[in-house]
């Protein structure tokens, strides 16, 4: 076992970067590590409220942090003052299952989306190579392109192609063991397996497969323990000539804080990008969607809709749904004129060619009582770092500027700094209501 205080200091540093000062003082500074007990870490917290908060929000971070620090699999046990005196030592074979832990997803069957097949995938210039590579992999898994690494923006069909490989392989070889999972689910399964002492079961589930499909691999960033586990999973499968397919929104070497040995392995096979569909492909996608929904839409109307949306397939199909709903409410046939009314004022992705990075910087600086020079500068104090990251995030979300361009506008910062800021804010938005409110306020201010 590592030194208890050294481990706790490491965990505190992690929490300090993840939590606000108020949150850190309220939850972390009031807790103290007591001792190791078998494969458990006893942590004393001052109240039932603190205990519930730790179990529901912070326990998984303790598991992850312990694995990162010393490659040990610890289960955190939270006790109130005086409770530790009544705890008896655990025998090695005893199991303690946290009541909060859910059944890991690897104990439940993972289903492929029945709609994501090669038959329903519309090919075009932006995805031809990815489609061809996916077909090859589905016919000869583990031979030519291993791993197959599909990368590109949101809503371009990466998940569709990935799952199509699984469907095709199962159709030709029904006995094949196919596993589809998001990177987030893999990480959660790994952490839950430690908490429930099911590590061996976890490894059997993920390593005893013929085809492993892992979606959105970029979310492994900052998860050192999960990366370590996936490294060994990858090696086992690759050495057994089992096929691995990964998707990401960027190339392996552009994923921040991804271990170099994983970057290297992800490049062993074929990295292939998927770009936004051209006009002809967008029309074909809409026609395919309309046929599937049994919609009667004139060709010129499909062309009009395709001309309005050039970002991704998801936005494109969403626009068609919007037009269909509008026609239903109006009790009218779908025409180009009706489509124009339905899509009027629609700002896809919230991006605006009129909105400048300078405007975003000005609004954010005023909101946080800072100067634009603060946002462009290099001071690393928390009161400036967060607003700076928010401004970079909004510049990425609300303008068409490239990463290097945004970095240049923020005092000549590297594009990877912008990528990290966008990733950090995106992840925080899933849990931080105050941040959500601030982003909404800022967006409304800039749109008004």
From Swiss-Prot:
<comment type="similarity">
    <text>Belongs to the DnaA family.</text>
</comment>
<feature type="region of interest" description="Domain II">
    <location>
        <begin position="72"/>
        <end position="110"/>
    </location>
</feature>
<dbReference type="GO" id="GO:0006275">
    <property type="term" value="P:regulation of DNA replication"/>
</dbReference>
<feature type="binding site">
    <location>
        <position position="158"/>
    </location>
    <ligand>
        <name>ATP</name>
    </ligand>
</feature>
<feature type="binding site">
    <location>
        <position position="159"/>
    </location>
    <ligand>
        <name>ATP</name>
    </ligand>
</feature>
<dbReference type="Pfam" id="PF00308">
    <property type="entry name" value="Bac_DnaA"/>
</dbReference>
<keyword id="KW-0067">ATP-binding</keyword>
<dbReference type="GO" id="GO:0003688">
    <property type="term" value="F:DNA replication origin binding"/>
</dbReference>
<feature type="region of interest" description="Domain I, interacts with DnaA modulators">
    <location>
        <begin position="1"/>
        <end position="72"/>
    </location>
</feature>
<keyword id="KW-0238">DNA-binding</keyword>
<dbReference type="InterPro" id="IPR018312">
    <property type="entry name" value="Chromosome_initiator_DnaA_CS"/>
</dbReference>
<dbReference type="InterPro" id="IPR020591">
    <property type="entry name" value="Chromosome_initiator_DnaA-like"/>
</dbReference>
<dbReference type="InterPro" id="IPR001957">
    <property type="entry name" value="Chromosome_initiator_DnaA"/>
</dbReference>
<dbReference type="GO" id="GO:0006270">
    <property type="term" value="P:DNA replication initiation"/>
</dbReference>
<dbReference type="InterPro" id="IPR013317">
    <property type="entry name" value="DnaA_dom"/>
</dbReference>
<keyword id="KW-0547">Nucleotide-binding</keyword>
<dbReference type="GO" id="GO:0005524">
    <property type="term" value="F:ATP binding"/>
</dbReference>
<dbReference type="Pfam" id="PF08299">
    <property type="entry name" value="Bac_DnaA_C"/>
</dbReference>
<feature type="region of interest" description="Domain III, AAA+ region">
    <location>
        <begin position="111"/>
        <end position="327"/>
    </location>
</feature>
<feature type="binding site">
    <location>
        <position position="157"/>
    </location>
    <ligand>
        <name>ATP</name>
    </ligand>
</feature>
<dbReference type="GO" id="GO:0005886">
    <property type="term" value="C:plasma membrane"/>
</dbReference>
<keyword id="KW-0446">Lipid-binding</keyword>
<dbReference type="InterPro" id="IPR024633">
    <property type="entry name" value="DnaA_N_dom"/>
</dbReference>
<dbReference type="InterPro" id="IPR013159">
    <property type="entry name" value="DnaA_C"/>
</dbReference>
<dbReference type="InterPro" id="IPR038454">
    <property type="entry name" value="DnaA_N_sf"/>
</dbReference>
<feature type="binding site">
    <location>
        <position position="155"/>
    </location>
    <ligand>
        <name>ATP</name>
    </ligand>
</feature>
<dbReference type="InterPro" id="IPR027417">
    <property type="entry name" value="P-loop_NTPase"/>
</dbReference>
<feature type="region of interest" description="Domain IV, binds dsDNA">
    <location>
        <begin position="328"/>
        <end position="448"/>
    </location>
</feature>
<dbReference type="Pfam" id="PF11638">
    <property type="entry name" value="DnaA_N"/>
</dbReference>
<dbReference type="GO" id="GO:0005737">
    <property type="term" value="C:cytoplasm"/>
</dbReference>
<dbReference type="GO" id="GO:0008289">
    <property type="term" value="F:lipid binding"/>
</dbReference>
<dbReference type="InterPro" id="IPR010921">
    <property type="entry name" value="Trp_repressor/repl_initiator"/>
</dbReference>
<comment type="subunit">
    <text>Oligomerizes as a right-handed, spiral filament on DNA at oriC.</text>
</comment>
<protein>
    <recommendedName>
        <fullName>Chromosomal replication initiator protein DnaA</fullName>
    </recommendedName>
</protein>
<dbReference type="GO" id="GO:0016887">
    <property type="term" value="F:ATP hydrolysis activity"/>
</dbReference>
<dbReference type="InterPro" id="IPR003593">
    <property type="entry name" value="AAA+_ATPase"/>
</dbReference>
<keyword id="KW-0235">DNA replication</keyword>
<comment type="function">
    <text>Plays an essential role in the initiation and regulation of chromosomal replication. ATP-DnaA binds to the origin of replication (oriC) to initiate formation of the DNA replication initiation complex once per cell cycle. Binds the DnaA box (a 9 base pair repeat at the origin) and separates the double-stranded (ds)DNA. Forms a right-handed helical filament on oriC DNA; dsDNA binds to the exterior of the filament while single-stranded (ss)DNA is stabiized in the filament's interior.</text>
</comment>
<keyword id="KW-0963">Cytoplasm</keyword>
């Amino acid at each position: 076992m590592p030194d208890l205080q050294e481990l706790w200091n490491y965990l505190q540093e992690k929490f300090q970067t993840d939590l606000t000062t108020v949150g850190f003082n309220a939850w972390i500074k009031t807790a103290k590590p007591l001792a190791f007990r078998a494969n458990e870490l006893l942590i004393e917290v001052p109240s039932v409220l603190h205990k519930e908060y730790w179990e529901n929000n912070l326990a998984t971070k303790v598991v992850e942090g312990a694995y990162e620090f010393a490659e040990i699999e610890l289960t955190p046990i939270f006790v109130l003052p005086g409770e530790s005196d009544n705890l008896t030592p655990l025998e090695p074979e005893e199991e303690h299952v946290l009541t909060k832990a859910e059944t890991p997803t690897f104990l439940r069957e993972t289903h492929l989306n029945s709609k994501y097949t090669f038959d329903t995938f519309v090919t075009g210039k932006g995805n031809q190579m990815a489609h061809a590579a996916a077909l090859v992999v589905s016919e000869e898994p583990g031979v030519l392109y291993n791993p197959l690494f599909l990368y590109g923006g949101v809503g371009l069909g990466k998940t569709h192609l990935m799952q199509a490989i699984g469907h095709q392989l199962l159709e030709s070889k029904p006995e094949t063991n196919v596993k589809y999972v998001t990177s987030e689910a893999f990480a959660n399964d790994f952490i839950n397996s430690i908490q429930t002492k099911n590590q061996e079961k976890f490894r059997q589930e993920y390593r005893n497969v013929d085809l492993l499909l892992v979606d959105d691999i970029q979310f492994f960033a900052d998860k050192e323990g999960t990366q370590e586990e996936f490294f060994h999973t990858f090696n086992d499968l690759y050495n057994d000539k089992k096929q691995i397919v990964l998707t990401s929104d960027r190339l392996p070497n552009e994923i921040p804080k991804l271990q170099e040995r994983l970057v290297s392995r992800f490049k062993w096979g074929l990295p292939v990008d998927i770009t936004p569909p051209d006009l002809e492909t967008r029309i074909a996608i809409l026609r395919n969607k309309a046929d599937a929904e049994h919609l009667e839409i004139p060709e010129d109307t499909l062309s009009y809709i395709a001309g309005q949306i050039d970002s991704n397939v998801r936005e494109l199909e969403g626009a068609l749904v919007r037009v269909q709903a509008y026609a239903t409410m109006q009790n009218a046939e779908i025409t180009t004129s009706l489509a124009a009314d339905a899509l009027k004022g629609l700002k896809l992705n919230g991006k605006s060619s009129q909105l400048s990075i300078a405007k975003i910087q000005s609004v954010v600086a005023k909101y946080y009582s800072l100067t634009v020079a603060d946002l462009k500068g290099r001071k690393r104090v928390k009161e400036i770092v967060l607003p700076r990251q928010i401004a970079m995030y909004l510049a990425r979300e609300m303008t068409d500027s490239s990463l290097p361009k945004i970095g240049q506008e923020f005092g000549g910062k590297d594009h990877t700094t912008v990528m990290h800021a966008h990733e950090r804010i995106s992840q925080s938005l899933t849990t931080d209501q105050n941040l959500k409110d601030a982003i909404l306020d800022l967006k409304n201010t800039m749109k008004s």
